Amino acid sequence: MNQQTGPVNLKTPQHVGGNGRSLISRTPIWARVVVVLLLTLLASVTCVGTLYAASVSRMATDAQRVLTSAESLANSALGCGSDKSLSDISQELVNATNDLNAELNGPQWDFFRDHSRFGSDITAAREMLASVDTLVNGPFTDLLNLSKRLQGFSLKNGSVDVSALMDMPDIVKQAHKDISQQLTKLNKVPTPSVAKVATVLETEKAALKTVDSMLGEYDGLINLLPQLLGEDGKRTYLVMVQNPAELRSAGGMVGTIAAITADKGTITIGDFATTSGWDIPEEPMDDTVLKERQVFGGTFDQYPATTTIDPEFQRVAQMNKYMWLYQKGNEDENVAGVLSLDPVFLQALLGATGEVKLSDGRVLDSTTTVPFFASDLYTDYPDFEQQNNFVSEAAQAIMNHVLGNANASTASPLLKAIRDTSASGHFKLWMADPDEQEALIATGLIDDKASGELSADSQVPETGIYLSELQQGKQDWYLKTSTTVTKTCGDVSASQNALYSGVLDKRIMTAVRNTQLGQFTEDQLGDEYTVTFTMKNTLTKAKAESLPDFVNGGSENPVLGGMLYRVVLTAPYGGEITAVQADIDSWGTNTASLYDRQYIMFNQQWIEPGKELTIAYTVRVSSDATHPLNVVTTPVVNADGVETGSNGNVTDECTADTNGADGANGADGANGADGANGGADGGKNDAHKDASSDPSAGLDALDKLKSQISCPVDLKSLAGSM
């Protein structure tokens, strides 16, 4: 038998035959053991690596879900708006947190903690996530369950049961307790070895403090909820609908009023009805009314429709409460508050909850509600009784629709609608209990402008221009206004020049009038501003003639389609209106005895169709003013939108080295970026600004985070800035 010698050709067919296998079988045993061990080790490493990679991937996904849902929830809670249902967002946050917690607490991470230098980091991460998990599955889930209880409510016979909200104080109290416990645990966590993990740990502790602080700001309101909802007995809230088709200083004529009652958590909406047949009280509400009559008219307080000639809503609300209680059957009712709405507010509510259909088939929605109330109603239904019926029907239908559709899905847009419209004067609020008023506004969900008052802060000066229609008709849909504010400087003031020349604005024919009252010394007064306010009647004569008599006034108006206004000017708190020029038909009063500021009233001349008139006046603000002058006007609603004054815009004619040059370019700038939201940022936000600007106090993480919270909320940016 021949023996083959030499190398074996592995490329021949015998490599796959029996002899090929025999070659492998002749491989040394130690080599095979090494190969098996290497393959086993490689497989083990691959499996472990795959296991951890998959776990990390799942945690990254879950963490992103937590972040996204928390961000959406914050936007919803702050009224910033969100495109997702509040209940869906809340449930996603619960699910994502539970999934993330379960993954990180898996046995694979026990091994990693015990056999690597990252043990302290794993422990810290677990403790941080455990604290979030405790809160999410504790008070947050309680709130979620509460929202689900509310989600199914419906309006029945004008009533809805929201008594579930009365459980909120206990839930929030538990949240404060849980947060305190979690902060105690996190403070005991050893310092992580990885700097980024240590930073995240500090960020979470700061965030928990912020959440606790923010909840604390809502404590007043939350603890009041049972009281507001009638836990101790029935309460009545009057809802006034003002119509800008017939302007009044505070917004518009009061067309209808309804009583909303809250009793043991059940809210009932009464009928919206006209006030034209109300009985007139025999005595004025109080002694202040006697002073108010000197400015606003001898009988302005005797009819709801004329009370809003007074621009101070807090007084208007009390007068309407007084008159409502005077009506037969209302004497013993407990009126706890008065709310004022206008078509802009109602339209915003429908934008959040959907459209309604009236009995004649007309659809009111986020674009048609304002034109209906301000114009179409009067041209399409010239009969007075029909108009009243449709106003009442529309207001009732909208409020019933909104209350019946207030749920987790609509909560965010509803909150945003209330927040935005209260900031622009279309939703106003007066509460009989000042603590309740303060608690409602302190939440930030209702802007502090909802009180309907001018700034009473001399550092944030505001002057007012208020219009009340005097002629017969509903023509203010056709009024267009523009406002300018100019800061003036020089050796001779603008008011002195105007009084000397008789001219402040060449468009005005009547001479300038000196309105200085001398209630302040020169040292108490600061910068001077010149304000112009132009009103244009956009009607043409042909259009005026085509309108129904109820709109253009018919034969009762000496100028068909003309506009005639009572004008009220108010000085900024601590300041003075020094000179006025206007085409005045009759001069009223100039007094500083009302509401601690100067009030000027006069009746202007007619504005004929196609014509315009201008009012000009000079203002000295207080010497301690730190913001430029803002002008607030009666909201004028027309086809182009809503006009409310200067919105903080100022033209500065002063040089850089003149006194107060920084004023017009102050903290909020002359462009009015913040002025539109309440006179250059006044009110509740000042406290944060003062705190953050104090060089001795410093800026800790909590204050920094809190100051950065604004709409829309961006948690990634907040976390990155810590």
Q: Which residue ranges define each predicted feature?
A:
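N-terminal Lys/Arg-rich, disordered targeting/topogenic segments
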Residues: 1-29
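Non-catalytic, solvent-exposed segments at the cell envelope interface
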Residues: 2, 25, 48-645, 654, ...
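N-terminal compositionally biased, intrinsically disordered segments and leader/signal-like regions
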Residues: 6, 13, 511, 656-659
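Coil-to-alpha-helix initiation sites in intrinsically disordered, low-complexity, charged segments
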Residues: 17-22, 28, 116, 696, ...
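Short amphipathic alpha-helical segments that mediate assembly, nucleic-acid/protein binding
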Residues: 20, 86, 179, 411, ...
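Hydrophobic membrane-insertion alpha-helices, especially the h-region
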Residues: 34-50
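Ser/Thr/Gly/Pro-rich low-complexity, disordered linker/stalk segments of secreted
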Residues: 650, 654-708, 713-718
